[in-house]
Amino acid sequence: MSASFVSPDVIRRLFAQAMSRMYRTEVPLYGTLVELVERINAQVLAQDPALAAQLQRNDERARLDEERHGAIRVGTVQELATLRRLFAVMGMYPVGYYDLSVAGVPVHSTAFRPLSGAALAQNPFRVFTSLLRLELIEDEALRAESAKILARRRIFTDGALALIDQAERDGGLAQADAERFVEQALETFRWHGDATVDLPTYHALHNAHRLVADVVSFRGPHINHLTPRTLDIDAAQAAMIEHGMAAKAVIEGPPRRACPILLRQTSFKALEEAVHFPDAEGGDAGTHTARFGEIEQRGLALTPKGRALYDQLLSQARDAGGEGSTGGDYGQRLQAVFASFPDDHDTLRQEGLGYYRYQLTDAGRAAPERVADLPAEVLVAAGLATADPIVYEDFLPVSAAGIFQSNLGGEEQRAYAAHANREAFEQALGVAVNDEFEIYERLQAESLAALRA
C-alpha cells in the first residue's frame, strides 16, 4: 500500500462515524440510546476497576465508545457481491454463515468485519448483511414480480462504484478520495420515504413476509438498526424502559453471568414510518415498520466445544415446558439450565470452552528465563502472565432471527422447506466466508507465541 494511501482502518472509522451521525438524524431515539449506553458504561467502569484495567490492557477501552454494528438486507446476488467489494475498501471481510430460514426469516447472512486484533482495536465496526432468498416465496407470480423489481434498482452511486474500482486497481485511496468514498458509500444505506412499488404490491409482499416487503419495496438497503455496545445490558434495558422505550421482554442470548459469553441483545420495537407509495394517479400515503434500536453486550468467544455446550443448554431451556422463549418464565428456565455452564475464567480456560489472550505481566517481563520453559497456565497461576477473554465479534443465529422477528411485528414463525444453502450464498458473495473459530484460534495462538518472543 502506497504511503500516501489512507489505512482501511481509518476509512472504516470515518464511515462508522458518518453512519452514526446519519442514523441519529433519521432515528432520534438512537441518539438517546447511545447517551444511555455511554452513561451506563461509565458507571460500570467506575465500579469495576479490574474490568477497566482489562479493557485498557487489551486496547479495548478506546474502541468501546465508538463500537457499533449495523444490519442491512439486500435483494440480489449482484448487490451482495458489490457490497463485499465496498466493505473490503474499509478492511471488512465476510465472517460466518447464518441461516435464518430455520427461524422463519427468508434470508441467509454473513457479518462483514475486521479480522486482525490490531484492526479490531482501531475500530471494530461490523455489518450483519442478509441476502433475501426469493426461492422461499411460495407465490410464483409474486416471486417473479419481486425479481423484476429488484433487477431494476441501483443501490450504489456511480461515484461509489468508481472509487471501489480505483481502490482495487491502485491498492488503496488517498485522503480526499477516502472522504469522497465514505460520502458516496453512505448513500447506499440511507432511508428513503418513497417506495418503489404501489400500495397493493407492497401489501402482497408484506403478506408473503414483512421482511420481503422491506427489501423489495425500497430504493436501497437502508440501515435497519445501529447497535452500541454496553457493559451491562440488564441495567441498559431497565434504563430503556424508564425512558419510555418499548423494550423487548426478553434479552436474547445467554443469561446474566459473572463471566459473560458470546452476545446478549435487546431492542425497542421498530418505528412506524410514513411512506409514499407511487401509482398512476399520484400515489398513496402509507406506513412501513422496519427500523429499530438495539443494544448489545459482548462476552467471551467460545471454542467449538464451548459453543456445542451453549447450543445444547439453550435448546434445553427453550424446549422446557414447550413454550420456547416466549413463556413468562423463560428467564428463570435459562438461568437454571445455564448453571451447568462453568462461570469462572479459570475453569472456562482449563476446560477449553473459550478463547483467551495471554500477556506477560511486569513480573513475567522481568523474568524471561522463567517464562521460556513454563506452560501458559503455570505462568498465569504464578502471576507471570494474564489471560483475558477474547471478545466475541460475531452474531448468534437464533438471536439474530429473534431480533428480526420481534421488531418486524412479533410472533410470526414459519418453517421453510429449504434451509441452509451456504454454497449458493458464497457463490453470490464471490468468496468463501471466513471461519470465526479459526480467527479466534489464531488470535489466541498469536498471544501465546508473543509470550516467548
Task: Place the predicted regions along the sequence by residue.
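Extended, well-ordered protein cores
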Residues: 1-453
